[in-house]
Swiss-Prot record:
MF term (GO), any: iron ion binding
Name of the protein in question: Prolyl 4-hydroxylase 5
Cofactor: Fe(2+); L-ascorbate
TM ranges: 23-43
Organism lineage string: Eukaryota, Viridiplantae, Streptophyta, Embryophyta, Tracheophyta
Encoding gene (name): P4H5
Segments on the Cytoplasmic side according to the record's topology features: 1-22
UniProt-listed GO biological process terms: root hair cell development
Length: 291
């Protein structure tokens, strides 16, 4: 009996050491796996500043993806930047090529007319002092270049081409603007074709020397924390603003994920202070938009 007891006492420490070794081995393996995931970019370490910032802090601008490294024509690399969650808005840098920008402008120039706004009572168009630019519409699939651009927009937004209106090309000269407004409709007429406007893609076809920003006065967040704050005009500092940079495209959603209208999507075009501004807009509807 004593012999068995001694054997039991000798065996117990060996069992304890074995468990410790197993636990240590598991920890080492986990550490190796984590290091591999970090090396592959699947995992990332949290940013120290992220703990002290709010969800809507605009300093937390994230570079989301990189799709090309540019070309010899000076078009630059393409990458996407989240600029706001309320409203949901992202900028696709170098979305268009220089040639595509010039092509859209050349198509629009011969038929430019004074821009109008939607009459909520009739669903038609009317002149208004809140919008002083000139513009024209290009039918959907106008030519091969337009088709390529529209397909790229659809791929970017994950919304079918058929849900989009034709491209609108706009021109703003010094002093011209578009005061804050919503792209979604508040009348029953304009929602009959395709339903509500769900998203807007605004493409900048030219650089602007000063002014001409797209401003979101109702955006939530620390708007003065954006890196380009000092480059903004007085109007641009009245909300979250995007500088008009040639080839860039701004996507923002007029509706929330639950399909309710998003009042934080209120936006406007600041007056051009110096130079002139060319842009092109694509509106998307919930359903197919018949042309």
């Amino acid at each position: 009996m004593a012999s068995k007891s001694k054997q039991h006492l000798r065996y117990q420490p060996r069992k304890s050491v074995s468990r410790s070794t197993q636990a240590f081995t598991v920890l080492i393996l986990l550490l190796v796996v984590i290091l591999i995931l970090l090396g592959l970019g699947i995992l990332s370490l949290p940013n120290a500043n992220r703990n002290s910032s709010k969800t809507n802090d605009l300093t937390n601008i994230v570079r989301k993806s990189e799709t090309s490294s540019g070309d010899e024509e000076g078009n630059g690399e393409r990458w996407v930047e989240v600029i706001s969650w309320e409203p949901r808005a992202v900028v696709y840098h170098n979305f268009l090529t220089n040639e595509e920008c010039e092509h859209l402008i050349s198509l629009a120039k011969p038929s430019m007319v004074k821009s109008t706004v939607v009459d909520e009572k009739t669903g038609g168009s009317k002149d208004s002092r809140v919008r002083t630019s000139s513009g024209t519409f290009l039918r959907r699939g106008h030519d091969e270049v337009v088709e390529v651009i529209e397909k790229r927009i659809s791929d970017f937004t994950f919304i079918p081409v058929e849900n989009g209106e034709g491209l609108q090309v706009l021109h703003y000269q010094v002093g011209q603007k578009y005061e804050p407004h919503y792209d979604y409709f508040l009348d029953e007429f304009n929602t009959k074709n395709g339903g509500q406007r769900i998203a807007t893609v605004l493409m900048y076809l030219s650089d602007v020397d000063d002014g001409g920003e797209t401003v979101f006065p109702a955006a939530r967040g620390n708007i003065s924390a954006v890196p380009w704050w000092n480059e903004l005009s007085k109007c641009g500092k009245e909300g979250l603003s995007v500088l008009p940079k040639k080839r860039d495209a701004l996507l923002f959603w007029n509706m929330r994920p639950d399909a309710s209208l998003d009042p934080s999507s209120l936006h406007g075009g600041c007056p051009v202070v110096k130079g002139n501004k060319w842009s092109s807009t694509k509106w998307f509807h919930v359903h197919e938009f018949k042309v």
